[in-house]
From Swiss-Prot:
Residue ranges that the UniProt entry lists as topological domain Virion surface: 1-16
Name assigned to this protein: Envelope small membrane protein
Function: Plays a central role in virus morphogenesis and assembly. Acts as a viroporin and self-assembles in host membranes forming pentameric protein-lipid pores that allow ion transport. Also plays a role in the induction of apoptosis.
Residue spans crossing the bilayer: 17-37
Organism: Middle East respiratory syndrome-related coronavirus (isolate United Kingdom/H123990006/2012) (MERS-CoV)
Length: 82
């Protein structure tokens, strides 16, 4: 074979290797970003399920009980108790 052809084949192999490495690194970076995003979403969902929802439930229940008992106040004590 001519030296020019061997040089072109070698250049093609080197370029293909560089392209493969760049694609692999890009793929790894994208996978790491997507995995981190998914982990953040799962943590937010767990935080919402374990802390926010029970807190809202307790707050709403306490508020409804407070409103319910605000409407029915106990009678004042007799005057002789004062």
């Amino acid at each position: 074979m001519l030296p020019f052809v061997q040089e072109r084949i070698g250049l093609f192999i080197v370029n293909f290797f560089i392209f493969t490495v760049v694609c692999a690194i890009t793929l790894l970076v994208c996978m790491a970003f997507l995995t981190a995003t998914r982990l953040c979403v799962q943590c937010m969902t767990g935080f919402n399920t374990l802390l926010v929802q029970p807190a809202l439930y307790l707050y709403n229940t306490g508020r409804s009980v407070y409103v319910k008992f605000q409407d029915s106040k106990p009678p004042l004590p007799p005057d002789e108790w004062v």
